[in-house]
């Protein structure tokens, strides 16, 4: 029997999230959860995969999956083509939201805030540790632009490979990182009967304010 969408569900059984076990600083809790996710989640789940939501000039939302590539006390860093659709949207409206979901742990983290470009030095440092194919692809692909077919993309890649045949590809000027500076971070822990735990951290004048939200 084919299961209908209305019947598709699972119950959550793991331990809850209490204020007593949650630090005052959300970065500490995120690092703890992220470490546990890297130790627990298995392929095909990528623990650093996240959905990134942006809005265009008309206020229409757009969402896609990216990988978190750096985390410090300033915020959450990802890299992309600055000329891509997301890059243009962030130029027009420098705010975004990201969501991490770790199904084995039955956890979700939502993050909202302002976005800024990282320094050229930070972008270059990460670019240089990427696999060669990824570095060549950053030069070859006119991301988010219409191309005729796959053959055109492969032709662009072949031309790029010839261009860098005798030298290592450097970081393109149209490619680099963004850092999301969080103003709100919500931690969600699945619980039985859909009575989930939600702890919401909001940045206020004197630090972070933590509140519990109804599921």
UniProtKB/Swiss-Prot annotation:
Superkingdom, taxonomy of origin: Bacteria
InterPro entries on file: Pyridox_Oxase, Pyridox_Oxase_CS, Pyridox_Oxase_N, Pyridoxamine_oxidase_dimer_C, Split_barrel_FMN-bd
Keyword Mitochondrion annotated: no
Keywords: Flavoprotein, FMN, Oxidoreductase, Pyridoxine biosynthesis
Alphabetical list of SUPFAM superfamilies matching this protein: FMN-binding split barrel
GO molecular function: FMN binding; pyridoxamine phosphate oxidase activity
GO biological process: pyridoxine biosynthetic process
Annotated Pfam families: PNP_phzG_C, PNPOx_N
Gene3D superfamilies attached to this UniProt entry: Electron Transport, Fmn-binding Protein, Chain A (2.30.110.10)
Name assigned to this protein: Pyridoxine/pyridoxamine 5'-phosphate oxidase
Organism whose genome encodes this protein: Stutzerimonas stutzeri (strain A1501) (Pseudomonas stutzeri)
Recorded name of the encoding gene: pdxH
């Amino acid at each position: 029997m084919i299961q209908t969408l209305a019947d598709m569900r699972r119950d959550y059984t793991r331990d809850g999230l209490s204020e007593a076990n949650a630090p005052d600083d959300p970065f500490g809790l995120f690092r703890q959860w992220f470490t546990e996710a890297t130790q627990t989640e298995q392929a095909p789940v990528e623990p650093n995969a996240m959905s990134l939501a942006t809005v265009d000039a008309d206020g229409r939302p757009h969402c896609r999956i990216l990988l978190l590539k750096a985390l410090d006390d300033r915020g959450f860093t990802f890299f992309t083509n600055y000329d891509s659709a997301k890059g243009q949207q962030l130029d027009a409206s420098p705010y975004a939201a990201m969501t991490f979901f770790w199904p084995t742990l039955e956890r979700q983290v939502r993050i909202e805030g302002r976005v800024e470009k990282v320094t050229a030095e930070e972008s270059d440092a990460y670019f240089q540790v990427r696999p060669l194919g990824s570095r060549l692809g950053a030069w070859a692909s006119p991301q988010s632009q219409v191309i005729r077919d796959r053959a055109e993309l492969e032709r662009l890649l072949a031309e790029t490979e010839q261009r860098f045949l005798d030298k290592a590809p450097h970081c393109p000027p149209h490619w680099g990182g963004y850092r999301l500076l969080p103003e709100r971070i919500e931690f969600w822990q699945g619980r039985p009967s859909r009575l989930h735990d939600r702890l919401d951290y909001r940045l206020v004048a004197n630090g972070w304010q933590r509140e519990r939200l109804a599921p």
